[in-house]
Regions:
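Nucleotide-activated chemistry modules centered on ATP-dependent adenylation/adenylyltransferase
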Residues: 1-111
Length: 111
């Protein structure tokens, strides 16, 4: 997540606005926590003179809540994926891919 943020900052140094991350509750990595957002915001505020805000709208949401939000709002999730291997296509084996498969297979969540 830090790499994504720093890449955005260096690619668009004159940008003014909000950069949103899709991090959510239930993942135990530093870069998926409120403290990470706060730490990165300090860097971005200094670098951009306060022009850029980092947002994580799903930070306190569990994955099933996000899936339901996608269903309710007709988000075209077939155009997205979450894979820890970072390839062009989902690997189908990492925890993120397995979670997504589980929810897609559920009768409650048809995305």
């Amino acid at each position: 997540n830090a790499l994504f943020l720093i890449t955005a900052l260096t690619k668009y140094p004159e940008y003014t606005g909000i950069i949103s991350l899709g991090i959510h509750e239930g993942v135990a990595y530093y870069d998926t926590r409120k403290q990470f957002i706060s730490d990165m915001q300090k860097i971005f505020s200094n670098y951009s003179n306060g022009r850029i805000k980092i947002d994580a709208p799903f930070l306190k949401w569990k994955k099933p809540m996000i899936y339901q939000y996608c269903i309710d709002n007709r988000v075209p999730t077939k155009l997205t994926y979450s894979c820890e291997k970072s390839g062009r296509k989902p690997c189908g084996l990492c925890n993120s891919c397995l979670d997504r498969s589980k929810w897609n297979a559920s009768s409650l969540y048809k995305i």
